[in-house]
């Protein structure tokens, strides 16, 4: 490609509304342009990167035995009503009616549609397992789109869905998809980790996320220092403390604390170690429990894990915190004065709270706290569960090493769905015994557009993007110095351009009448991994200069050896 025939719309200045590096560089490199909140035009440079990612994804999906299909982005509402998600999904599901007043949605995902295909096309267990995928645009009406294409409203996704007669068959496909995803992200050149994850609104039994490590990531990823254990912090288990509860050394005492309505204020004003305090959080209970509210207790320096808490049998899902009015009606005290003694609500305590002694907590009287609280002396030990986020230094759940926490960007997610959708939509086949059986499902998603941003977050410097070779918009840039004044430079540049293209190499030939500084800056900004600089001085010795974008290494290469040299760099 010649720059004279290309839309190379780079920017010198960083747009003011671009918050993270990938958003800034994608705008400056001319990869995207904002159309509206959460909506972006993809320009030629961006599309070239997308197509290379899609090619890798297709190859690995095909190798894993998945079949490509294409489903409409517009979906009839009756499928969503049939599955139950019409009521479950919030305003992020864009709903509309056609001219005949028939309700439709813009698809954020395609479980319903693909299950409808299978229930109409597949009749026998002999046609299973079946794995179908597509690469297609999705729409989710995010309340606050941000970070460019990292969290946009419209995005490109690879979504796959598998159908099985048994859990064993699902597990086999799940394992193949796990490996296919690992292959995809390895080939792209990302530093990633597969981690155990919560199934979220998709549902199902087992789930793994594929997280790209980056400081700008929105997820906290937990790793063991001594094993392969990795999990999203939402799912990482906080194991039972190994040290038993110490004997009581303090008397229970009621203390006036009129100006201490938070743990931080309590610690500061009364010189308490924060690990000797307990937070009491009130949430809604399930109807089946016979209670309106339930109290959750975590250590003062720990954070409640809402995903774990939701899994407690008497906690309503989704988790809803009680309002101050609800708390005062139930306890006759405000949120800053709550504690376990004489609390007229069911209580669930975190494992770490169960081994505490001589601790402080609210007295359920405004402006008062109890200090020196001890279980089984001042109150019975409450129901115990793992309801907190792990912290760095906690023991790994597999018993090997301790935990580290890093930030991650989720680029892939695989689920064992089970029968959630197939039962709702009555997707059955005839089994080996001749009876109708509901099929078991898996689903597997990759954020194609998000991969672009994640790759930039991992691969950039002050000058611009540093693409991994596999997804660079161009593999090689040819920069002829003063080509329009030097016939020799032009001749060598044209020949190298033709020779490299003949080898199937993506080349960007900068034939603009621009200053060398502008040419270099643009190629570094858009992240071309390999650059050939052609100038009269080096041609006197029949040489050109090669520069590697990632390492900044430079070397002189004989003109006749350039093609072979570049092919070696691309291996």
UniProtKB/Swiss-Prot annotation:
<dbReference type="InterPro" id="IPR004500">
    <property type="entry name" value="Pro-tRNA-synth_IIa_bac-type"/>
</dbReference>
<dbReference type="InterPro" id="IPR002314">
    <property type="entry name" value="aa-tRNA-synt_IIb"/>
</dbReference>
<dbReference type="InterPro" id="IPR023717">
    <property type="entry name" value="Pro-tRNA-Synthase_IIa_type1"/>
</dbReference>
<dbReference type="InterPro" id="IPR006195">
    <property type="entry name" value="aa-tRNA-synth_II"/>
</dbReference>
<keyword id="KW-0436">Ligase</keyword>
<dbReference type="InterPro" id="IPR004154">
    <property type="entry name" value="Anticodon-bd"/>
</dbReference>
<comment type="subunit">
    <text>Homodimer.</text>
</comment>
<keyword id="KW-0547">Nucleotide-binding</keyword>
<keyword id="KW-0030">Aminoacyl-tRNA synthetase</keyword>
<dbReference type="GO" id="GO:0005524">
    <property type="term" value="F:ATP binding"/>
</dbReference>
<keyword id="KW-0067">ATP-binding</keyword>
<keyword id="KW-0963">Cytoplasm</keyword>
<keyword id="KW-0648">Protein biosynthesis</keyword>
<comment type="similarity">
    <text>Belongs to the class-II aminoacyl-tRNA synthetase family. ProS type 1 subfamily.</text>
</comment>
<dbReference type="GO" id="GO:0006433">
    <property type="term" value="P:prolyl-tRNA aminoacylation"/>
</dbReference>
<dbReference type="Pfam" id="PF04073">
    <property type="entry name" value="tRNA_edit"/>
</dbReference>
<protein>
    <recommendedName>
        <fullName>Proline--tRNA ligase</fullName>
        <ecNumber>6.1.1.15</ecNumber>
    </recommendedName>
</protein>
<dbReference type="GO" id="GO:0004827">
    <property type="term" value="F:proline-tRNA ligase activity"/>
</dbReference>
<dbReference type="GO" id="GO:0005829">
    <property type="term" value="C:cytosol"/>
</dbReference>
<dbReference type="GO" id="GO:0002161">
    <property type="term" value="F:aminoacyl-tRNA deacylase activity"/>
</dbReference>
<dbReference type="InterPro" id="IPR033730">
    <property type="entry name" value="ProRS_core_prok"/>
</dbReference>
<dbReference type="Pfam" id="PF03129">
    <property type="entry name" value="HGTP_anticodon"/>
</dbReference>
<dbReference type="InterPro" id="IPR007214">
    <property type="entry name" value="YbaK/aa-tRNA-synth-assoc-dom"/>
</dbReference>
<dbReference type="InterPro" id="IPR002316">
    <property type="entry name" value="Pro-tRNA-ligase_IIa"/>
</dbReference>
<dbReference type="InterPro" id="IPR050062">
    <property type="entry name" value="Pro-tRNA_synthetase"/>
</dbReference>
<dbReference type="InterPro" id="IPR036754">
    <property type="entry name" value="YbaK/aa-tRNA-synt-asso_dom_sf"/>
</dbReference>
<dbReference type="InterPro" id="IPR045864">
    <property type="entry name" value="aa-tRNA-synth_II/BPL/LPL"/>
</dbReference>
<dbReference type="Pfam" id="PF00587">
    <property type="entry name" value="tRNA-synt_2b"/>
</dbReference>
<dbReference type="InterPro" id="IPR036621">
    <property type="entry name" value="Anticodon-bd_dom_sf"/>
</dbReference>
<comment type="function">
    <text>Catalyzes the attachment of proline to tRNA(Pro) in a two-step reaction: proline is first activated by ATP to form Pro-AMP and then transferred to the acceptor end of tRNA(Pro). As ProRS can inadvertently accommodate and process non-cognate amino acids such as alanine and cysteine, to avoid such errors it has two additional distinct editing activities against alanine. One activity is designated as 'pretransfer' editing and involves the tRNA(Pro)-independent hydrolysis of activated Ala-AMP.</text>
</comment>
<dbReference type="InterPro" id="IPR044140">
    <property type="entry name" value="ProRS_anticodon_short"/>
</dbReference>
